[in-house]
Amino acid sequence: MTVKKVTRLRRARKARLKMHELEVVRLCVHRSSQHIYAQVISADGSKVLASASTLDKELRDGATGNIDAATKVGKLVAERAKAAGVSQVAFDRSGFKYHGRVKALADAAREGGLEF
């Protein structure tokens, strides 16, 4: 692994430990060069309550690696989380910078009704 990835994973591990201690439901984000993924994970980390990604049938046809796609994923995961009965989450950015696609997803999830 590259040094950049190792430091990102270290940051993510520290943040997840704090969220686990608080026992809150978390919105976990992962991004690759082509896609973005979001999952709402239960407080104990054992169950995925809702998920959305650019690989979903509704989003697969358009562009998948840009800010517009991240916004659509954020709205979709917020809609699915509310359907599952989740309204408050902790935002787990998985060590990625809060910038660009990650920020767009978070803003869209907030607009969709999730409270961070």
Curated annotation (Swiss-Prot):
Keywords: Ribonucleoprotein, Ribosomal protein, RNA-binding, rRNA-binding
Transmembrane region(s): none
InterPro entries the UniProt entry points to: Ribosomal_uL18_bac-type (IPR004389), Ribosomal_uL18_bac/euk (IPR005484)
Superkingdom field: Bacteria
Pfam families, per database record: Ribosomal_L18p (PF00861)
Cellular component GO terms held in the UniProt record: cytosolic large ribosomal subunit
Molecular function GO terms recorded: 5S rRNA binding; structural constituent of ribosome
Function: This is one of the proteins that bind and probably mediate the attachment of the 5S RNA into the large ribosomal subunit, where it forms part of the central protuberance.
Family according to the record: Belongs to the universal ribosomal protein uL18 family.
Protein name per its UniProtKB record: Large ribosomal subunit protein uL18
Gene this chain is encoded by: rplR
